Amino acid sequence: MTRKFASIRRLLFTTLVMAALGMCACGPADVGAPVPVYDTGADTTEWASIPAGEFLEGQHETAVSIDHDYEMMVFLVTYEQYAAYLNDALATGTVRLVDNTIVGHYPGDEFRGARHEVRIDPGDYLHVALNDPALRLEFREHAFTVTPGWEVHPMTMVTWFGAGAYCDQYDWRLPTELEWEKAARGPLDGRESNRPFPWGSEIARNNANYYASRDPFESMSSYGSRTTPVGFYNGKIYGAFATIDSHSPYGLYDMAGNVWQWTGDVHPFEHYRYLRGGSKDTYDMDLRIWVRNSAAPTYASPGVGFRCAR
Amino acid sequence: MHPIRQRLQFLFSSTKGLILMAMAMVAVVTALFGMLSGPMAEWGVRDVVVRLLGMKLVQAEREGRIIILYHSIAMAIIAIESYMITGLVKMRPIHRVVVNTGVTAGYLTTMIFGLLFAYWGRLWPFHGLFIAGLTVMFSSGVVLTVALWPWNKEFYIKGPKSEYARTRSGLDLERAAFFAMAATTVVSSTFGAVAGAYFGNGFEAFLAENIIRSPEKTTLEYSVIGHLHIMLALIAIAVTLIIGRWLDFKGLYQKIAMPLMILGVVVLNLGVWGVVTPLEPIAHMIIYMGATPAMLAALMLVIFGFDKLIREGVRGIDRPTFGQKISALTRDPLRFGSLWQMVFMNFTVSGIGILMAVRLDEIFRVWPAREERIELTGHWHVLSAIIATIILFYYGDLTGLKGRLRQWYGWLIIVLSDAAFASVTFFEMKRLFISEAQQQPLVNWLMAGIDFGLGSLLVVLAALMVWRLTDLFKKKGLWTREAAEENLYQVAK
């Protein structure tokens, strides 16, 4: 009887050890896997006008007013745009190349000594780390070019400092959280003013790029979810994949999914910067308009990008 | 007596029947509502379930739904623990009846009407009944606390010598630990109730993990955060005490453990209650000071239990080898498993917490909040699931599993759950050893470990439930014997 019990234990432990070995044997994803190319027809220079006025802010739908008109980019800043900016900025000296990183000056934040607050003094801060294999930029002969195929994908692997510096270069800025949220949700006009997603009440796989949304750029069995070109979810059909036109009430694309977007607020008592919109790596619940994410301003990720406001 | 009435009487009035009923309810709820998130949503199962069952899921109400789901499952688990306590600890029969009746009415009302309200449209009378269910649970907790009153001379440990922890006057310190746990559970529940009443009135439900980085939290937000932490800790402490009773914890280790447990419970609670007072800045320090003796008490139980299993297993062998001792230790997977899970918990819950605290500046001060959320929700889901597996081990013994069935049941739970918990732990910590861009193959393996482990565990639980269900159809089934047993393993002290 005892021998039978021992065999049960042995069988189960062997299964466990085999599974553990299998896990150890798995290699990292191929970051350089080929990317499909589709023409979305997006005009990446377009801006959307957002008038002053009330909208429903947050999950609990508080009526809040923004007292100024502003504009936001219809599309996320692309790799192509960021490469052109870097070439300009390096030439004019607003950013510098140091040890395979792009750095630039930041005037610092007031430090209040709150719990968990990290000091951000005036100085040079990381904008982009050039040696990260997930970055789709190449630096050859003193100029930046985009890895072929990624030109109109959102700029990623960029820190909050790097995103802000891009906007600054053209006398623009990062949107505040409130501005971002109004641009995603639309005005308080009685027609679905409390929509949880920029396009409406429900989410389908062809509304946005999120985790396991089965778009042509993802392969969950190998490299996982990847960015889609900006404005991809515009109602066009790409091969066998039909998208739904998923712009926000003000006409902005990718306000849910694809990449988290840096916002410009510097909140007192904390060093964190806030991100909105969810990304290719999050479940649909994080694509709801009011969901916030935050990270240190030096954080960069293949799932983080930005757009500017003015 | 009518056959149906006999069976209902077993399910609703005998201790083992009540435990079986509550476990079946938890199994059904876990299986059903587990299909609405994670990989099940990813694979499209959620959409099918929602359509088939006619659920109404409003995006803005997700957090509220989850809060009600957590409470529904938690109340059933608290009911199971209450049944076990009333079956294990001496008390007046009237107290046992009132507690068992109260928690049964309480958890069933909470679960049924809470879930109907949350997932099938907001029908307000159901919300009222959900709150009423929680209130009945609270009242039953008060009665349980009274029933466990340790200064009742009737329950003193008498005689000149005893193997159990007691004061010089005979006060049973294990009973005092049960009492401390029950009393503080009742008080700590109000930290959720008061805050819940406020937020519920404005319907501003939030999940604690989503406000973790807010630099300024209100007192009521702190109250909610404190409540959820302490309630889970107290459920874990209750199960530790229950397992101690099951294994007849006694001797030197028990005499050291019980004062430590009482001290730990009291200080831990004071620390958590401190979060809503000016003591908030040092509350964490007080919590650590309370958690340490409580965990040491659990360590004493593990040492005692392992030693007991080895002694029993090598009885008759003159000089047992190391291998024979290990074989003896692992011979009974139910008793070994209940103790092993307490050890394993240190790798998947406490150890992770300590590691994160040590590397705070390079992890949480830099990582995005969503990564921090994964770590936070991961470690307390694991703790909850570990508690559930310990209950399953004890129930396996209670229901009389023997021989090969006991071996398969016990080892499957140990291996499957630990594979899943280890995978969750690696998933939480993955950013320390792999970048986001390169993580997918590893994530797939880990998700497979989690899904296979937990899914198979649910299959084991389902098999147990089906077996017990078929047994109910037998005229002279196991249920007829269990119906007659009032106590579980009450040990005369």
State each model region's role:
Chain A
Residues 2-15:
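Bacterial N-terminal signal peptides that target proteins for export
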Residues 23-25:
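C-terminal motif of bacterial Sec signal peptides marking the signal peptidase cleavage site
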Residues 27-29:
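Bacterial signal peptide processing site
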Residues 31-39:
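Short, low-complexity, disordered segments immediately C-terminal to signal peptides
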Residues 41-124, 157-161, 257:
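A short glycine-rich, aromatic-capped structural motif
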Residues 56, 138-293, 300-302:
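Functional-site microenvironments in short loops/helix caps that host divalent-cation chemistry
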Residues 97-143, 206-216, 220:
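Core domains of carbohydrate- and sulfate-ester-processing enzymes
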Residues 302-310:
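Short, structured beta-strand segments at or near domain termini in extracellular proteins/domains
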